[in-house]
Amino acid sequence: TLAWSSAASDVYKRQVINLPKFYIDFKDKDSRNATTDVKKEIQRLKAEGMDGLVLDLRNNGGGSLKTVVDIGGLFIKEGPIVQVRSTGEDREVLSDRDKSVDWDGPLVILVNEFSASASEILAAAMQDYKRAIIIGSKQTYGKGTVQNVIDLNRMVKNNKSGDMGAFKFTTQKYYRINGGSTQLEGVKSDVVVPNRYTYVDMGERDQDNPLPWDEIQPANYTLWESSIDYQTMIDRSRARMDSSPEMKLIDDNAQWIKKVQSKDLYSLKYDVYDTGLKLNEKESKRFETLKDYQSGLSFESLPYELPLMENDSVFKKNRERWHETLQKDIYMEEALNVLTDLTLNPKGDALTILKE
């Protein structure tokens, strides 16, 4: 559940930080938290000569609001990260006030449909500042609200009726620094890549009675100063995705999953039903090749982890399993391709590729 990093082993110093959630222990200020861990990983990666960074927020369901503001501050000089508003109250702008920047180089953020809450805040802020390119699902989960929980057992003295349960209610909404809410709409990726859930209904918008999307006044912020032509980089990535046979197969798989899930009429005739099963089995086998995909990339742990791997077989096995997963990760592969574009050709000039 903690942040950790890895390095892609090739000519370019492209690094990856995986952040599974925005964790903090408010009862113990000296304990590990997401901000200090990410900051430490950045320092270690820079010591290895990092040229570009991928921050992986896929499946990150959120966490501490404080840590997301602090982590956002690692990538900008200073400024607002998110706005919060309660009913009948003025908006509150939460800002990074530290002028130091821990990483000012190329940054790509990976998201998916399960990136929610604090993950959306960070991705949205970096997108609004034009500080990072967001790659992933069509949109993130779309949870732009804050809930509080009241233990009803504490409300009733001398309760003899058993567990009274809890009462959960929404108290606030998050807003991007550009004024738009992340509620329902989430964060729309700059480069949309298909996955098996692309056409499946999920997210806050698919829950019962979700609060609507709205917008408020934008915060006062300044775009990140950079010579990078982000739109050209985004267009190049989109072109790669459009021409990728693997991405086409992933999209076909997603449409097939949607078709199967949407079917609600089944024939009672055995031969018709059996024919349908065989067709589904045949179609399913067409997508099995996706499991065998290899990017050709290799990943390695940082030097500080090597002694840990020697002394802890479980830790070593977990790292090796993660690296094997990254080698098959077509989305990570494209994120690293974008980093290469940003590093070698930030102004978006035409590239001439020489082949032997």
Model-identified regions with their sequence ranges:
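Polar, glycine-rich mid-to-C-terminal structural blocks
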Residues: K130, S137-M202
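Conserved functional hotspot residues or short segments at active or partner-binding sites
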Residues: R176-T352
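Short, solvent-exposed mixed-charge patches
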Residues: L354-E356
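Cleft-lining beta-strand/loop regions that shape enzyme active-site pockets
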Residues: S5-M155, E324, K328, T340
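Short, well-ordered junction/capping motifs at the entry into regular secondary structure
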Residues: T1-L2
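Flexible glycine-/small-residue-rich
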Residues: N18-K21, L57, V111, F169-K173, ...
